[in-house]
């Protein structure tokens, strides 16, 4: 069983500040992994589809997911669906089994009514400037709340992911001299160039 408490300290270092959203990602990620019986990804064993959008509160949640599940931008096994929600669908590539986990709306609303949000974040104060005595109790609540009070966990279901193969082919752009992945190359006046140079 994956224990989110084992990842809190590392998660805060990785994330850069204390807030309730990153720990919520730890809790949700752990619940998803435990439900389908997977370990933290060392490579691309699992893929996470996160319903977050851009430029809204609590996107810090995604860092908690990345930390605990090992689904990272670098490995390409975490994708944003841009739905403006906090659900994650975790897929085990080995067997095509998946689970959808989301924080309960009540838990999210409770956090949004806290002094952390009302007195600081909504007034434009960065999370790193919020006093520990304000943020620590909310983090404690998120990390210690019973799972059934904090998150919704779906039944396991089938999820078909098309197999993919990493590309190792590349070239040096004939205009800017930067290394470029072959499939992103363009032809411009008979020269092999990158997307940026093709647009000039």
Regions found by a protein language model. Name each.
Residues 1-18, 25-200:
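Non-transmembrane, aqueous-exposed alpha-helical and coiled segments at domain scale
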């Amino acid at each position: 069983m994956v224990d989110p408490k084992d990842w809190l300290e590392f998660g805060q270092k990785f994330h850069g500040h204390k807030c309730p959203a990153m720990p919520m990602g730890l809790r949700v990620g752990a619940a998803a992994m435990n439900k389908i019986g997977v370990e933290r990804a060392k490579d691309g064993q699992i893929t996470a589809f996160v319903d977050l959008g851009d430029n809204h509160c609590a996107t810090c949640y995604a860092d908690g997911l990345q930390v605990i599940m090992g689904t990272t931008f670098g490995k390409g096994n975490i994708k944003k669906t841009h739905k403006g929600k906090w659900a994650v669908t975790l897929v085990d590539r080995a067997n095509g089994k998946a689970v959808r986990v989301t924080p309960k709306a009540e838990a999210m609303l409770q956090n949004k009514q806290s002094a952390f949000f009302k007195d600081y974040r909504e007034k434009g104060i960065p999370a790193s400037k919020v006093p520990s005595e304000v943020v620590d109790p909310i983090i404690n609540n998120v990390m210690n709340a019973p799972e059934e009070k904090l998150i919704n966990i779906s039944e396991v279901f089938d999820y078909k992911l098309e197999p993919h193969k990493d590309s190792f082919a590349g070239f040096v752009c004939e205009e800017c001299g930067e290394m470029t992945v072959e499939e992103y190359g363009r032809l411009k006046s008979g020269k092999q160039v990158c997307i940026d140079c093709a647009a000039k």
